[in-house]
Every structure is written in C-alpha cells, then in structure tokens.
Amino acid sequence: MTDLQIAVDPTTDVEALILDWAGTVVDFGSFAPTSIFVEAFARAYDFPVTLDEARQPMGLGKWDHIAALGRLPSVDARWQARFGHPMSHAEVDHLYHTFMPLQIAAVTRFADPIPGVLPVLDALRGQGMKIGSCSGYPRPVMETLVPAAADHGYRPDHWVATDDLKAGGRPGPWMALANVIELGVNAVHRCIKVDDAVPGISEGLNAGMWTVGLSVSGNEFGATWEAFAAMSEAEIAARRAPAEAKLRAAGAHYVIDTLADIAPVIADINRRLAAGERP
C-alpha cells in the first residue's frame, strides 16, 4: 500500500470516486474495445475501419458507439461508396451482435490494472473513500471483466453497465447517479467522476460532480503501457497535449496523466469544498 495521506473531514470532503473502467483503472490505452470494433466491422461486412476511427466515439455505450462510428464522415463516405446508403439501424444491430461475443472473449486479456492505480485506491479506501464505477460496456461484458479484474486485485464497491438503466448511459448522468444511490453518498458535489473519454466527463458534469480527465492512460493518448514506457519525454508531451486539450474542452475540472496521480486533486477539491465552492 502506498503511503498516501489526505486529511479527511467525513462531513464535508470528497466521499466517493466514480471510476470508468477501460483506460481508467484497467487496460492502459483502452485497447479492448477499440481493437474489437475494428475486428467486428471486418468480420460482419469485410469493411475496414482504422483504430483511430474506432477511438473517436469512445465512452458511449457500445451500440451507440457503433452507430456514431458509422456517422463519422470518413466512415460514412466509404460505407456509402461500398453499399450505396448510410449505415442502417439493422446494420448497426448486426455489427453489435458480431461485436459482443468477440468483446466478451477478449476482455479478460485486458483486465490488468493500470500501473500505480491499485495502491492509491487501496490507500484511499483505507481512509474511508467509497469506490464506485461505471462503463460503456454492456452487462454481459462486465460480467466477464469484473471477476477478471478482481483476480488482479481491483474490486470496486459498486459497478454499473451501460445497459443496466432504463434511462440509458453516457453522456447522461444516470450510471454515475446510480452509484451515488447504491453507495449512500450524501451529496453529488462530494463525488469525483474520473474518465479518459469525453462522454464520461459529460456524464460527471451532468451528474453535478467534479470531473477528472486522464490524458495518458486512456483512449485519447492511445498507447500501450509498453509503448508509453519506451517513449521519450518529448514524445509523451506531444501526445499528451491534444489529449489534455480535448478533455479540458469537454469541461474537465482537472486533467492528470493517470488515476495514480489523483491524490493532489482530491486534496485540492477538499480545499475548494471547504471554501464553499461547488463543481
């Protein structure tokens, strides 16, 4: 356990973290969903999409992600040239049903925690912090990922899948708020929503929470841990800058490299809460 101490006032300070999964706690670079989108398009329609295209709608529920991917100008132009019409609802359904078994089969390979994250979460939990979570993955994928992550030591207090709630998923606030209810958090302004993608930042803002974007560990940076570790400081800075800019433009209150860097943010938010500030 890391030696992390944050003075905590249980009546006023941050009470809960609401964490995304891929690119936030597990799967450095968020490769499990993106690589499978590419494979699903190839299998279902022998249609190529690039990894960069697959990353652009990241954070949405996976059916919505496929539909948004089909609306990207580059994908839509190629689709219409190939098939003579925009991607239809039925075609999105077919892609989704192709995607799901591939994702379920692959997700356990991407359950490794992001380096440095678990010791920080253990230390925070030891000080009374509640750990909630939600994902753009549907429940069948989460039912495979959650026990795999537990085998690696990550066990949040609660998790919500993108298809669990009648109201829907991101960018709406509902998954984050379902965590608030389940965890018994006393006020949404005492929660921090942490995510590596824009829809997750919007989710936190819509829920009335503080939001923290992750500029290196997730979708926007888009590198494996091994590739990141081999980069020079200049290379890291060049890739971090647009990721940080995108997350800040989405409204993130803070942007850090990875969840392992969250402690100073919590301390600063506690200071702001004590001064009467709200998200």
Swiss-Prot record:
Gene Ontology cellular component annotations, sorted alphabetically: cytosol
SUPFAM superfamilies, per the entry: HAD-like (SSF56784)
EC numbers for this chain: 3.11.1.1
Cross-referenced InterPro entries: HAD-like_hydrolase_sf, HAD-like_sf, HAD-SF_hydro_IA, HAD_sf, PGP-like_dom2, Phosphonoacetald_hydro
Keyword annotations of the record: Hydrolase, Magnesium, Metal-binding, Schiff base
Cofactor(s) this protein requires: Mg(2+)
Species per Swiss-Prot/TrEMBL record: Aeromonas hydrophila subsp. hydrophila (strain ATCC 7966 / DSM 30187 / BCRC 13018 / CCUG 14551 / JCM 1027 / KCTC 2358 / NCIMB 9240 / NCTC 8049)
Pfam families: Hydrolase
Superkingdom of origin: Bacteria
Segments traversing the membrane: none
Record-given protein name: Phosphonoacetaldehyde hydrolase
Biological function: Involved in phosphonate degradation.
Binding site for Mg(2+): D20, A22, D196
Enzyme class: hydrolase
Active site: D20 (nucleophile), K62 (schiff-base intermediate with substrate)
NCBIfam families associated with the record: HAD-SF-IA-v3 (TIGR01509), phosphonatase (TIGR01422)
